């Protein structure tokens, strides 16, 4: 037995979450450990027939103020904070008739769960734990003498340690680190929520941002093999792609996650059944279909079958057996969906390496952050929900008003172009992209690329002719539009707002092309 183990003779237990409490209490009692406990925890232990000392018996002071004060007392904290390596501490304990604790087991009031439930302000405030964090921090500070455990998932470690003569110093230090992280996350949640309650409605961004993330996985590498990488999750946030359930395939890579996030967002930009195929965070193809999700996948893939090789597929509907059969014929890195029809996973998993994920619908009110040197940029995520994203609010600037069918085509293109890196021009026909010009430093080249890809990837077919186009930002000159008109594009939707809008609109009228202005922009960098 290592000399730095601290035999557990006395334990303080105060937990809101009673998971595993019975096994823990019985194991401690069987090992001869004295248990001191509080409130409902003490009552639960007593109901088990396990000897327990209520904390008020220890302090000689009753629980008061509706339970707000239970453990905030020197008889408790002196027993936690005494450094038993020091003779003067031991002497003071003896003089004060205080016995030291070697183990503190505490978990906190469910503050974040209460906030998430929609409870009112006072109810949320009532769930801000005071005594719990005080005990946890005290025990963590005094880890040379005390082990602190804040999660029921670690109770098995306590039971093992009791049988082995206590925790080692290294184990107590690791537990202390876990405890400080726990209280730090708790305080961040409280401070963030309180700040939101007093925020000025005209200033939607908080004066202070705190965040806590837990490492979920160390990845093989980052964007490139020489870059180390890891995945972290926010335990207080609603589940998202980072918490997706993987049903099959190799481990997710850094690039798999970035492409999957782009694909998942792109698919859910559409209310209709949609499939998005993404590679290097840009669409190879996006399509909607009211016929079947398999049809949406077929037409999305047809946009650019060359680039779709090794891509990421996202569906905003259940993946059908028919779609699974189509996907199984193509090399695909990742497929993500809210669910899979019976038999679909069996078909997909015939490919050993394909990663099959189940993920919840993305949250619609997220802020997004981007690190820059010395700080972080924060913005509301582009959810394609600006006033100008609704066709009813568009302005007809040139040509004849669109039919219901044509307007639906334009709306699809407009929603799809959000997923394309700027400068972006997207061509669509029949509810599917047919040519995507992405990531160009001028709009003329983006238009040329969209037309070239629409036509060159279709053999003898000139898919640009008769298509509709969406531009993520205005045309600064008429030249970008003229590329589209010469290719036979029949209608264009774009934000407008250029000082040369009149020139662009005049060119559209001359070409007989319908043009709508949205007043909204969808840059993506």
Swiss-Prot record:
The pathway that the record names for this protein is: Purine metabolism; IMP biosynthesis via de novo pathway; 5-formamido-1-(5-phospho-D-ribosyl)imidazole-4-carboxamide from 5-amino-1-(5-phospho-D-ribosyl)imidazole-4-carboxamide (10-formyl THF route): step 1/1; Purine metabolism; IMP biosynthesis via de novo pathway; IMP from 5-formamido-1-(5-phospho-D-ribosyl)imidazole-4-carboxamide: step 1/1
Q: Which GO terms describe its cellular component?
A: cytosol
Q: Which cysteines are joined by disulfide bonds?
A: none
Does the record's keyword annotation contain Transferase? yes
Q: Where is the MGS-like domain?
A: 1-150
**Gene3D superfamilies the UniProt entry points to:** 3.40.140.20, Methylglyoxal synthase-like domain
One example of a Gene Ontology biological process annotation: 'de novo' IMP biosynthetic process
Which residues does UniProt call coiled coil? none
One GO MF annotation is:
IMP cyclohydrolase activity
Recorded catalytic activity of this chain's protein: (6R)-10-formyltetrahydrofolate + 5-amino-1-(5-phospho-beta-D-ribosyl)imidazole-4-carboxamide = 5-formamido-1-(5-phospho-D-ribosyl)imidazole-4-carboxamide + (6S)-5,6,7,8-tetrahydrofolate; IMP + H2O = 5-formamido-1-(5-phospho-D-ribosyl)imidazole-4-carboxamide
EC number(s) per entry: 2.1.2.3, 3.5.4.10
Q: Which domain of life is it from?
A: Bacteria
Give the InterPro entries listed for this entry: AICAR_Tfase_dup_dom_sf, Cytidine_deaminase-like, MGS-like_dom, MGS-like_dom_sf, PurH-like
Keyword annotations of the record: Hydrolase, Multifunctional enzyme, Purine biosynthesis, Transferase
Q: Which PANTHER family match?
A: BIFUNCTIONAL PURINE BIOSYNTHESIS PROTEIN ATIC, BIFUNCTIONAL PURINE BIOSYNTHESIS PROTEIN PURH
| Comment, domains | The IMP cyclohydrolase activity resides in the N-terminal region.
Task: Describe the family membership recorded for this protein in Swiss-Prot or TrEMBL.
Answer: Belongs to the PurH family.
Q: What is this protein called?
A: Bifunctional purine biosynthesis protein PurH
Origin organism is Corynebacterium diphtheriae (strain ATCC 700971 / NCTC 13129 / Biotype gravis)
């Amino acid at each position: 037995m290592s000399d730095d183990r601290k035999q557990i003779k006395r334990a303080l237990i105060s937990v809101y979450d009673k998971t595993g409490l019975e096994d823990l209490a019985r194991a401690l009692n069987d090992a001869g450990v004295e248990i001191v406990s509080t409130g409902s925890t003490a009552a639960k232990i007593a109901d088990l027939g396990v000897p327990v000392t209520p904390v008020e018996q220890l302090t000689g002071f009753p629980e008061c103020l509706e339970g707000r004060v239970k453990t905030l007392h020197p008889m408790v904290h002196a027993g936690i904070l005494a450094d038993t390596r020091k003779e003067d501490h031991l002497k003071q304990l003896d003089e004060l008739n205080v016995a030291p604790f070697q183990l503190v087991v505490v978990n906190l009031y469910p503050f974040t769960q209460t906030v998430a439930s929609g409870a009112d302000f006072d109810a949320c405030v009532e769930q801000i734990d005071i005594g719990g964090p005080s005990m946890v921090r005290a025990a963590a500070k005094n880890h040379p003498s005390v082990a602190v455990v804040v999660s029921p998932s670690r109770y098995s470690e306590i039971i093992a340690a009791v049988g082995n003569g206590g925790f080692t110093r290294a184990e107590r230090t690791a537990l202390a680190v876990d405890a400080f992280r726990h209280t730090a996350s708790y305080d961040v949640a409280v401070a963030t929520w309180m700040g939101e309650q007093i925020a000025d409605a005209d200033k939607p961004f908080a004066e202070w941002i705190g965040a806590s993330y837990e490492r979920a996985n160390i990845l093989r590498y980052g964007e490139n093999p020489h870059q180390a990488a890891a995945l972290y999750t926010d335990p207080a946030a609603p589940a998202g792609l980072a918490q997706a359930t993987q049903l099959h395939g190799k481990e997710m890579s850094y690039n798999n996650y970035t492409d999957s996030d782009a694909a998942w967002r792109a698919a859910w930009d559409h209310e209709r059944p949609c499939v998005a195929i993404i590679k290097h965070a840009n669409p190879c193809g996006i399509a909607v279909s009211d016929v079947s999700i398999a049809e949406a996948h077929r037409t999305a893939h047809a946009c650019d079958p060359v680039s779709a090789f090794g891509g990421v597929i996202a569906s905003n509907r259940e993946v059908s057996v028919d779609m699974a059969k189509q996907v199984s014929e193509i090399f695909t890195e990742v497929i993500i969906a809210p669910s899979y029809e019976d038999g679909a996973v069996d078909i997909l998993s015939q490919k050993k390496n394909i990663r099959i994920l189940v993920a919840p619908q993305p949250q619609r009110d997220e802020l997004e952050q981007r690190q820059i040197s010395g700080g972080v940029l924060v913005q509301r995520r582009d959810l394609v929900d600006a006033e100008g994203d609704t066709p009813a609010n568009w302005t007809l600037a040139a040509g004849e008003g669109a039919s219901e069918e044509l307007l639906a085509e334009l709306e699809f293109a407009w929603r799809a172009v959000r997923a394309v890196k700027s400068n972006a021009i997207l061509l669509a026909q029949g509810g599917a992209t047919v040519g995507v010009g992405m990531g160009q430093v001028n709009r003329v080249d983006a238009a040329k690329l969209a037309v070239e890809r629409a036509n060159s990837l279709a053999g003898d077919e000139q898919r640009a002719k008769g298509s509709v186009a969406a531009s993520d930002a205005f045309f600064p000159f008429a030249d970008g539009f003229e590329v589209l008109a010469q290719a036979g594009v029949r209608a264009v939707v774009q934000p407008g707002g250029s000082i040369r809008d009149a020139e662009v609109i005049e060119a559209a009228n001359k070409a007989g092309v319908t043009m709508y202005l949205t007043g909204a922009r969808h840059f993506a960098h």
